[in-house]
Amino acid sequence: GQPCSARWRSEWGAPPPARVTIADDSMTADAAHRLACEGTALLWRGDFQNARQLLNAMARRADRHPPKPGTSPAESFHFHRQTQSRRARILGMLLVPLEEDYEIPLRRAPDLRLACTEAYGPGEGQALVSLRELLGLVGAHEWRKNGVVVPALGDRIHPHYGVFSPIRSEYVDLVADAPLPSNALAFDIGTGTGVLAAVLARRGVSHIVATDQDPRALACARENLARLELTDRV
């Protein structure tokens, strides 16, 4: 084989693997799990659906080692986080290639170009990404397309990739039901999808200032508030 290179993609800042080996449909789950535990990434060249099955098998093997009990709640939490981090690192070792337009050059691979573009922006050459992250893009794309029902809003919010989704209603209900000291002005710091700003606007607050330091969150909030026709208040 000839040497080749590709851009490394990791939305969560995982470092590129130091060692990479080619893997295909002939690789067993035990061998894949062992290599991943040793720090060797597996660049998949086989069938895409078989890669998904292999990832599930690797996850089952990783879950055979639960965190050890701690002598205190803090220590137990630390061990739990340690185990979860190790699990994520192992499962992140199964890699798939992406073409410049985000096409996946594998047999039976789905068309995930739109999901990748929504998360990564325009393509910048060939790349490698963990299959686990790629499957996360699929879930995020479905949320963005279909939206999440927010009962307190009586409508849907469409979260973008990397923006916290309002799937838990407790904090939204709290803002929807809490007495307001004034209807003149409110601030939504860390607006995310814009869901709380939208709830406050629907409650009659005249002017809401919504802020966030993440450009993707700001774009998401603007899109949601425009869809809900609340941009005159927020």
Segments and roles (model prediction):
Residues 132-180:
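Class I SAM-dependent transferase core
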Residues 15-17, 66, 151, 159, ...:
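Proline-rich intrinsically disordered, low-complexity coils
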Residues 1-19, 50, 86, 159, ...:
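Proteins with a high burden of low-complexity, intrinsically disordered sequence enriched in S/T/G/P/A and R
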Residues 168-234:
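Conserved SAM/SAH cofactor-binding pocket of Class I
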Residues 95, 143, 157, 223-227:
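Hydrophobic transmembrane alpha-helix bundles
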Residues 1-2, 6, 10-13, 17-148:
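N-terminal auxiliary segments of SAM/dcSAM-dependent transferases
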